[in-house]
C-alpha cells in the first residue's frame, strides 16, 4: 500500500509583483531574491518542497519576512501559489473549484491566527458554535458541541462570558476551541501565542501539547520563537528569504545545522532541550542494580534531569511498550548539562 502524505508541497513558489510569472518562467526556477527585488517583485516562497505525515506537527519558523506565513497561506490556498503543486490528502488544490475549496476548508481544515478575531457581541459558547451553524448544524446541536469544546480547552464556567471579559490567553483558547469544533483533520496555526505574555504563552503551549496528545491532528504551526518550536515540533523547517534552509527533527537542526544561517539560529540552544534519553543511555546490564524511578527513551533530557540526578542508582529506560531498553546514568546527564551533548 503506497504512502499518501496529508500535505505535500512540490516546488512551490509565491512571488508578488506584476511580472512575477514571466520572470519565474525565464529564470527556470532559479530564483535570486535580489534580482527579483530589483525588478519590482518580492519573493515570498522560493521552491518549497516537503511533506507532512498524518498526525505530524511541522513547525515553520524564521525571522519576520522569511516567508513562513506566506507559505502557510499557500498551503491553505488563502493565497494562490505562483507556481508548483500543493496536495491535501492527494487532492491538487489548484484543480479545485471555489465551491470544492470552501467545502475542503469547512470539513478538513482548522485555522488559528495571532489575532483572536472573536465576535465581540457573542459569548464564548456562541463564538465556538458559530462555524457549526454556518455549516448548517441545528442550533441545539451546535451549542452542545460547542460546550464539549469549552470543556476540552478548560473554559467550563466561562461559556457565557463575552470576549472583553476574558484574558488574552482565555480568548486564544476560545479561538482554538472554535477551530476544533468542526473536527478538522488538518490544523493551521500562524503565531497563535506570540501576542501573549511569556507565562501565558507557556501555559498555552502546555495546553496545545495536551490537546495534540489527545486529538493527533496534522499540524502546520508558524512561529518566530525557536524555544517554542523546540517544545512543540516533530520536525522544524527554518526559512530565510522564502527558502527552506533546513527541514529536520529538532535534535538534528540543533546538532547538525545544514547551513551557516541555521547554525547561527541554533548556536545558543542548550543541548538538553533537544537531546532525548535514548541518545545518551547505556545498554541494559542485567547485573546492574537500577532505581525504581523510570524514564521513557523519547523523553527530552531537560524534562527528567532533576529527577535523575536525585537518584543514587542508574535509571531504567523504557520504550513505548514499557519494556526496559537501557539504563541512564547521572554522569551522562551531567555531561549534557555542563560538558557538551555527550551523544553515543
List PLM regions with ranges:
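A short, proline-enriched helix->beta-strand linker immediately N-terminal to the Walker B motif
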Residues: 181-185
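ABC ATPase "signature
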Residues: 247-248, 256, 327
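Helix-to-loop junction immediately C-terminal to a conserved catalytic motif
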Residues: 76
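The conserved cystathionine-beta-synthase
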Residues: 290-320, 327-344
Amino acid at each position: 500500500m503506497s504512502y499518501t502524505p496529508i500535505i505535500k508541497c512540490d516546488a512551490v513558489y509565491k512571488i508578488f509583483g506584476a511580472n512575477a510569472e514571466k520572470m519565474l518562467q525565464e529564470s527556470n526556477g532559479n530564483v535570486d531574491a535580489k534580482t527579483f527585488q530589483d525588478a519590482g517583485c518580492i519573493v515570498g516562497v522560493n521552491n518549497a518542497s516537503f511533506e507532512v505525515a498524518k498526525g505530524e506537527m511541522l513547525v515553520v519558523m524564521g525571522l519576520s519576512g522569511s516567508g513562513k506565513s506566506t507559505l502557510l497561506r499557500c498551503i491553505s490556498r488563502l493565497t494562490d501559489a505562483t507556481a508548483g503543486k500543493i496536495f491535501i490528502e492527494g487532492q491538487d488544490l489548484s484543480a479545485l473549484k471555489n465551491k470544492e475549496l470552501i467545502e475542503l476548508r469547512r470539513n478538513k481544515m482548522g485555522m488559528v491566527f495571532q489575532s483572536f478575531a472573536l465576535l465581540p457581541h457573542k459569548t464564548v459558547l456562541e463564538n465556538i458554535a458559530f462555524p457549526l451553524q454556518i455549516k448548517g448544524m441545528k442550533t441545539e446541536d451546535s451549542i452542545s458541541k460547542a460546550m464539549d469544546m469549552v470543556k476540552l480547552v478548560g473554559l467550563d464556567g466561562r461559556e457565557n462570558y463575552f470576549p472583553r471579559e476574558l484574558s488574552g490567553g482565555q480568548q486564544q483558547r476560545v479561538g482554538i476551541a472554535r477551530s476544533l469544533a468542526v473536527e478538522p483533520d488538518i490544523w493551521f496555526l500562524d503565531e497563535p501565542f506570540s501576542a501573549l505574555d511569556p507565562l501565558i504563552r507557556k501555559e498555552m503551549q502546555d495546553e496545545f501539547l495536551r490537546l495534540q496528545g489527545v486529538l493527533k491532528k496534522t499540524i502546520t504551526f508558524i512561529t518566530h520563537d525557536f524555544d517554542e518550536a523546540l517544545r512543540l515540533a516533530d520536525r522544524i523547517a527554518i526559512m530565510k528569504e522564502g527558502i527552506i534552509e533546513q527541514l529536520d527533527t529538532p535534535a538534528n537542526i540543533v546538532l547538525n545545522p545544514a547551513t551557516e544561517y541555521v547554525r547561527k539560529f541554533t548556536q545558543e540552544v542548550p543541548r538538553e532541550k533537544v537531546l532525548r534519553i535514548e541518545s545518551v543511555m547505556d545498554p541494559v546490564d542485567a547485573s546492574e542494580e537500577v532505581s525504581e524511578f523510570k524514564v521513557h527513551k523519547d523523553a527530552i533530557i531537560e524534562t527528567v534531569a532533576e529527577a535523575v540526578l536525585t537518584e543514587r542508582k542508574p535509571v531504567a529506560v523504557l520504550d513505548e511498550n514499557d519494556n526496559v531498553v537501557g539504563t541512564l546514568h547521572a554522569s551522562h546527564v551531567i555531561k549534557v548539562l555542563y560538558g557538551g551533548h555527550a551523544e553515543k
